[in-house]
Amino acid sequence: MNFKYIVAVSFLITSGYAESVKNDEQSLSQRDVLEEESLREIRGIGGALLSVGKSALKGLAKGFAEHFGKRSAEDHEVMKRLEAVIRDLDSLDHPEEASERETRGFNQEEIANLFTKKEKRILGPVLGLVGSALGGLIKKIG
């Protein structure tokens, strides 16, 4: 009788243990499913926020580029003049190359007159452009 009692108790313990393991597995799988769903939701929300942030930054960058990148016709002309002045100044930095290119066949006096005229032609617009650029900056700041 003791043997039957031990077997019956062992059977009850194993079946109880098996059922608790089964319940644990189910609760773990349910918990895993819930965690996975919540992670998907969080990822979805995070992805949406990230895409909104990216588009906002792109829009902001585009707005800044449009605002600060716009040039009026007057600004465009000023920039063209500045580029021409810079080219002329570059030719003054290398007078040998400029004189070879521009003044072939002139005598020394004509070359001296040409450089004097070129210096006058450069300094006038440069001072005017610098003054107008500073004036424009002061107006925009003020």
Curated annotation (Swiss-Prot):
One of its GO terms (cellular component) is extracellular region. Residues 19-43, 72-121 form a propeptide. Maximin-y shows antimicrobial activity against bacteria and against the fungus C.albicans. It has little hemolytic activity. It comes from the Eukaryota. This is Maximins y/H11. Residues 1-18 form the signal peptide. Expressed by the skin glands. One of its GO terms (biological process) is defense response to fungus. The keyword Chloroplast does not apply. It comes from Bombina maxima (Giant fire-bellied toad).
